[in-house]
């Protein structure tokens, strides 16, 4: 009798990465009745981000093969340090807990089940050491795009093979020729900020170095979206197998992630959208960490009022703690221009938390001012909503560059904006970007609608991502 296989997934904490992990687990379980999955859950020690509510909701999710998936909560660790280095160290501090959890799993597994390997988040490469200790293969789940993955490999090779100090790119006018991009990359403008830090940059590039030790990389993208980047990775003899398996999205059960209070907020928002004409509303939302200072908030408000376009604006206040998530305002008037809410009462709606998927799916929404996180990008493409790019941190500037210059699926508000730069984006630039993204008969809108159809076909039987996922399943059976 053929043995069942079990995969151990290790995502980083944060709702975006956990949701993506569960969604790819669902796809795998639906494709192989002889597969079991365990997901090890790390938690941030500060403000909750909805992960607990989401995981509890999975018990009643009809699309989940609950008898073949389980969640193991790891003991909570303290977050010491700040910035990227503090975050990476926090992830690595869970190694002993992961080792204990896997040891218990191996002691209790039945003789008819074999552990087929670790599937680690893109920032969990320290867990490769544990996989090696247990004699198990490891795979990477890369939750960003293929072009960004190619950039990581490129920068790592510059450091390790050409002895290049990547921090020198910070104030340079260098343009990088990277095989996963068609156009040269303006380094100072779009490289992830962490690359410009000596310690954090080395941490970051070591991830790519360690990817090369694994058996393959699952990438949350699809062939039709990034054909050049995927081809460049596939033809590079130094890079292990890459499996484009996206878009990995939680499009069917977003409502399960929210409390009853947020469910009421969601209903109010959707009722307001129901009263708006088709494709007439621009949606502004900047992700789970997205927030601005008062000066920038006022520039956005002036742009919206002057532009006269219907808007739905997710406006959140910065955390009062050094490390933490943005929260909802108790009074928007404290930060908005005087009289703004009264003057725009028939034009738009200001909200706090936003049910992003439900909003993007609504026919009234015609454009999305976005931080260009990869999940948000894929969601916008899935629903055929053009993007105006306003990145904050991490790989978001790279994503914005790819969307605007490479894929022609977005317009620019400020592609090189960085959250901690102190730069204020002008109301004129904001208004211009919003008007461009909201053009009804534009070539951009046509391209995004076409890509939306391709994103859905990729996951259908015999679609590009469906086939790629099948190749991965074949790989774990033979490893």
From Swiss-Prot:
It comes from the Eukaryota. Keywords: Glycosyltransferase, Transferase. GO terms for molecular function: flavonol 3-O-glucosyltransferase activity. UDP-alpha-D-glucose binds at residues 143, 354, 356, 371, 374-376, 379, 395-396. It catalyses: a flavonol + UDP-alpha-D-glucose = a flavonol 3-O-beta-D-glucoside + UDP + H(+). The active site is at 17 (proton acceptor), 121 (charge relay). Optimum temperature is 35 degrees Celsius. Residues 454-479 are annotated as: Disordered. Its EC number is 2.4.1.91. It holds the Pfam family UDPGT. Optimum pH is 7.5-8. Strongly expressed in achenes, with lower expression levels detected in receptacles. Induction: By de-achening. By injection with salicylic acid, with transcript levels increasing by a factor of 5-6 at 4 hours post-injection, remaining stable until 6 hours post-injection and falling below control levels at 8 hours post-injection. Down-regulated by synthetic auxin naphthaleneacetic acid (NAA). Broad spectrum multifunctional glucosyltransferase. Catalyzes the formation of flavonol 3-O-glucosides during fruit ripening. Accepted substrates include several flavonoids, hydroxycoumarins and beta-naphthols. Uses UDP-Glc as a sugar donor, but not UDP-Gal or UDP-GlcUA. May also be involved in detoxification of xenobiotics. Belongs to the UDP-glycosyltransferase family. This is UDP-glucose flavonoid 3-O-glucosyltransferase 6.
